[in-house]
């Protein structure tokens, strides 16, 4: 059954992957170079089958795989390449494309507006983003570091305190859902949070998926469900409307890296973009991602700077909605709904 493991973790019938990662011992890595850390990481990860663990197998050890991931993320943070902007700045003192140094968040709450299988979802909204989408509907938090006209009400993020909040709300939530903006620039903070968290809960990575391969490797063995936002079916639309290069190539690659994981793909249908984007995305999913379920979303409205772009300066027509549904049927997608 698709999403079967997630459902088991959500009901406390199976351990979350980050819990398992804390039970996988690694050799002492203090003082090692980044390439040496990766060598240990990849060697250990190849041997682990996360589906073969139950609660009887669990015993926390030190140092463990999650500790190692945190250490690798600390190294990357100082020469940042979590995402494909690959700024290579030391974020302790410098700002890259996303303008984010330490992590801030806007809010956290039990979200009832996600997909039915996810709610109630304990959703943590990080401030900032590695995209500059001209149509962003969460622009007040995603674009706060880019646009000085947006009031900044972001809250300093403390991983240890957030772990306590997640634990407290677990009785009422099916999962913890890291989103933004985008969570990618906050990957170090998220891994630290999970290292403090001792409550079994599925981890949802809710992202635009513009990560580097290195960023993707850090997520492997930690994330239970990838909730991905697949926006464009070509590189040109990605660069024009989200200001990122090689969009389609990178997002395809990253989805192929998680083709054996549990994945929910969201696609926001946009006016005038069914041929260039929607159909191309559906075709790719149909040919490559058997495990994925898809949420075709029709709630597009021209937000933020969309009025400056004539092709997306309106809502969808009935005909466009109907065509998108016909395409989903044509490509035999496994649909999921809000």
Curated annotation (Swiss-Prot):
Lineage here is: Archaea, Methanobacteriati, Methanobacteriota, Methanomada group, Methanococci
Domain Radical SAM core per the UniProt entry, residue ranges: 111-334
Q: Which residues bind [4Fe-4S] cluster?
A: 129, 133, 136
Q: Which organism is it from?
A: Methanocaldococcus jannaschii (strain ATCC 43067 / DSM 2661 / JAL-1 / JCM 10045 / NBRC 100440) (Methanococcus jannaschii)
SUPFAM superfamilies reported for this sequence: Radical SAM enzymes
Protein name per its UniProtKB record: Uncharacterized protein MJ0674
Q: Keywords in alphabetical order, please.
A: 4Fe-4S, Iron, Iron-sulfur, Metal-binding, S-adenosyl-L-methionine
TM annotation in the entry = none
Query: InterPro entries attached here?
Result: Aldolase_TIM, MJ0674-like, Pyrv-formate_lyase-activ_prd, rSAM
Provide the cofactor list for this protein: [4Fe-4S] cluster
